[in-house]
Curated annotation (Swiss-Prot):
InterPro entries: Dihydro-acid_dehy_C, DihydroxyA_deHydtase, DiOHA_6PGluconate_deHydtase_CS, ILV_EDD_C, ILV_EDD_N, IlvD/EDD_N. The modification N6-carboxylysine is found at residue 124. Pfam families: ILV_EDD_C, ILVD_EDD_N. Its cofactor is [2Fe-2S] cluster; Mg(2+). [2Fe-2S] cluster binds at residues 122, 197. Pathway: Amino-acid biosynthesis; L-isoleucine biosynthesis; L-isoleucine from 2-oxobutanoate: step 3/4; Amino-acid biosynthesis; L-valine biosynthesis; L-valine from pyruvate: step 3/4. Homodimer. Its EC number is 4.2.1.9. This is Dihydroxy-acid dehydratase. Belongs to the IlvD/Edd family. NCBIfam families: ilvD, PRK12448.1.
Length: 615
């Protein structure tokens, strides 16, 4: 029988000093011997997805106490990718994932906590906590802050948009046809409430995936931050973590541990969900890194295989202007998408979750498109936006009058009515990316699925943005942004501004963008990222010259630089004769010691850009 980890500091004569300190936090004699649950909060006033989390750790702690445990809260950092976007702040976003993972590990292990609740929400916080949970492998439950409501009606260039988001504001900012007054209206409407940005961007994608992988409760990925129904997720997370902690420590039931829940079959299901819902390309980085922490042999080849057989069942912003997360919720949330995949025979059924003994039980109870969903599930998915600007959680009780169960033309479709027969994410290979690169096919216009054009080469995101705004990029071009990978950036910046500004200039369907950096979950269009190997590691992208023809064929999963091999060989010889080969020729970019430390240990995007620490 495993012993409570916390006994190390709560039992025995020599731990009198530690117990004295525990007592100073409010613990009593009755608490020693109960499971101590670490509550990793990520409240910050910098991030709308986290601004409302301040008191929610206490809500979890109260539920932990009621269930027979002792909750102790701490905080991690949280970077807002949208605020950090388009300047040097974005260099810190991906590296913050590793810092968050380390911070959770440090706090949990330093204080010998027995179990963990992760209160996450935005882009790198959920992945960072997921890495930590799989690394620690103690009973863990995730509960996120929830999605933001979509921005409401505005007119852009004479067209009324019933729902808008952050990306609409970014695109409008570079559109000369949008007046300052119109832009101000869009800006003020785009982000109306607390919560993670309202589309199927990185934050919401990852929160949906923690639900699919079995470490979060049903409804976690889609229940709005502002809705009163979300309160029960925090209470239930506190109760559930104590239940599974007791099953492990009192019953030696290892099936409740994160690595048993998030096993290979669960990862495959998570990827199936990801490609079915057209999730952010960043999810691939994070799932690869998480699989490594779980000690699973799971790589881009596995993701590629799944993406070829799983259809795209949902197109949510930025892949469609019609739907946001509030619409996914009305359609039954993640259980509805999983239910459609299960009925199509596309899920591994031999999985379980922290809340259910089997996938069959899980979906029977929570899939509102099935015939046995519980009243609790039906009630939850009626939760609707409040339509009021607020930073307060649980502040609306609005309800949809009906659910969207239209599998033929609704927000979530069945296999027979899928948007495409293969998934919303794809892995491409070729001489430009022998280790692979990633494209969100759900956001690519059909006429752009095959594309060829001359390269316009930039050695920083800043130079590319300047060129786009100066109208130097024209229809038919392939914009190549290199030396922005994990090592070359360092930090693997997101390229949301270049893609948004291309759209704002009317080039969203006329150009391709290729980078060894990455893209925001808000990106759509022919945007290909994670080119591996990256330029700084000697990848072929470092040898591309202006005017070179690049050929992209998404249906056949290929990407090629159409330059003769002998010419490329000569370019490589010249590159390696430089004083500092595989570095930008003229870029001036301050790089701090913290970023240099990340760069020195960062692996390729094809490995998840995790930090490889020497033995």
């Amino acid at each position: 029988m495993p012993e409570l980890r916390s006994r190390t500091s709560t039992h025995g004569r020599t731990m009198a000093g530690a117990r004295a300190l525990w007592r100073a936090t409010g613990m009593t004699d009755d608490d020693f011997g109960k499971p101590i649950v670490a509550i990793a909060n990520s409240f910050t006033q910098f991030v709308p997805g986290h601004v409302h989390l301040k008191d929610l750790g206490g809500l979890v702690a109260d539920a932990v106490a009621e269930a027979g445990g002792v909750g102790r809260e701490f905080n991690t950092i949280a970077v807002d990718d949208g605020i950090a976007m388009g300047h040097g702040g974005m260099l810190y976003s991906l590296p913050s994932r590793e810092l968050i993972a380390d911070a959770v590990e440090y706090m949990v292990n330093a204080h010998c906590a027995d179990a963990l609740v992760c209160i996450s929400n935005c882009d790198k916080i959920t992945p960072g906590m997921l890495l930590a949970a799989l690394r620690l492998n103690i009973p863990t439950v995730f509960v996120s802050g929830g999605p933001m409501e979509a921005g409401k009606t505005v007119a852009i260039e004479g067209i009324v948009h019933s729902k808008i988001d952050l990306i609409d504001a970014m695109i409008a900012a570079s559109n000369e046809a949008v007046t300052d007054d119109q832009l101000d209206q869009i800006e003020r409407s785009a982000c109306p409430t607390c919560g993670s940005c309202s589309g199927m961007f990185t934050a919401n994608s990852m929160n949906c995936l923690t639900e699919a992988i079995g470490l979060a409760l049903p409804g976690n990925g889609s229940t709005l931050a502002t809705h009163a129904a979300r309160r029960s997720l925090f209470v239930d997370a506190g109760r559930t973590v104590v239940e599974i902690a007791k099953r492990w420590y009192d019953g030696d039931d290892a099936t409740v541990l994160p690595r048993a829940v998030a096993n290979r079959a669960a990862f495959e299901n998570a990827v199936a969900l990801d490609v079915a819902m057209g999730g952010s390309t960043n999810t691939i980085l994070h799932l690869l890194a998480a699989a490594r922490e779980a000690e699973l042999d799971f790589g881009v080849a596995d993701i590629d295989t799944i993406s070829r057989r799983v259809p795209c069942l949902a197109k949510v912003a930025p892949n469609s202007p019609l739907y946001h997360m509030e619409d996914v919720h009305r359609a039954g949330g993640i259980p509805a998408i999983l239910g459609e995949l299960d009925r199509a025979g596309l899920l591994n059924r031999e999985v379980h979750a922290v809340h259910s003994p089997s996938l069959a039980t899980w979906l029977a109870d929570w899939d509102v498109r099935g015939d046995a969903a519980t009243p609790e599930a039906v009630d939850l998915f009626h939760a609707a936006p409040g339509g009021v600007r607020t930073v307060e959680p649980f502040s609306t009780t609005n309800r949809w009058s009906t659910l969207d169960t239209d599998a033929a033309g609704g927000c979530v479709r069945d296999r027979a009515h899928a948007y495409t027969a293969d998934g919303g994410l794809a892995i491409l290979h070729g001489n430009l990316a022998p280790d692979g690169c990633v494209v969100k096919t759900a956001g690519v216009p059909e006429e752009c699925l095959t594309f060829r054009g001359p390269a316009r080469v930039y050695e920083s995101q800043d130079d590319a943005v300047a060129a786009i705004l100066a109208k130097e990029v024209t229809a038919g071009d392939v914009v190549v942004i290199r030396y922005e990978g994990p090592r070359g950036g360092p930090g693997m910046q997101e390229m949301l501004y270049p893609t948004s500004f291309l759209k704002g200039r009317g080039l969203g369907r006329a150009c391709a963008l290729l980078t060894d950096g990455r893209f925001s979950g808000g990106t759509s269009g022919l945007s290909i990222g994670h080119v591996s190997p990256e330029a700084a590691a000697g990848g072929l992208i470092a040898l591309v010259e202006p005017g070179d023809e690049i050929v992209i064929d998404i249906p056949n999963r290929t990407i090629e630089l159409a330059v003769p091999a002998d010419v490329l060989d000569a370019r490589r010889v010249a590159q390696e004769k430089r004083d500092r080969p595989y570095t930008p020729a003229d870029r001036q970019r301050p790089v701090s010691a913290a970023l240099r430390a990340y760069a020195s240990m960062a692996t390729s995007a094809s490995d998840g850009a995790y930090r490889r620490v020497p033995e």
